[in-house]
């Protein structure tokens, strides 16, 4: 599974873990709702970059 980093605040979305905002573990970044935002700073999904 992949990880994505918020380019604004550095929050890391880990697909294997989901997030504390009712996103289940195993949820792919591409499958997050269009209105999902960074739980730390509120940035849109387009502020995230895939980590190597």
From Swiss-Prot:
Annotated residues for binding of Fe cation: 6, 9, 38, 41
Free-text remark on how the cofactor is bound: Binds 1 Fe(3+) ion per subunit.
Ranges for domain Rubredoxin-like: 1-51
Cofactor(s) the protein requires to work: Fe(3+)
PROSITE patterns reported for this sequence: RUBREDOXIN, RUBREDOXIN_LIKE
Keywords: Electron transport, Iron, Metal-binding, Transport
Gene Ontology MF terms in the entry: electron transfer activity; iron ion binding
Origin: domain of life: Bacteria
Alphabetized Gene3D superfamilies for the sequence: 2.20.28.10
InterPro entries in alphabetical order: Rubredoxin, Rubredoxin-like_dom, Rubredoxin_dom, Rubredoxin_ET, Rubredoxin_Fe_BS
GO biological process: alkane catabolic process
Function: Rubredoxin is a small nonheme, iron protein lacking acid-labile sulfide. Its single Fe, chelated to 4 Cys, functions as an electron acceptor and may also stabilize the conformation of the molecule.
Entry's family note: Belongs to the rubredoxin family.
Protein name: Rubredoxin
């Amino acid at each position: 599974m992949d990880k994505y980093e918020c380019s604004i605040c550095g929050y890391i979305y880990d697909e294997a873990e989901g997030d504390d905002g009712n996103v289940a573990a195993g949820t792919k970044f591409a499958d997050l709702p269009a209105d999902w935002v960074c739980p730390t700073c509120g940035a849109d999904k387009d502020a995230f970059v895939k980590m190597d």
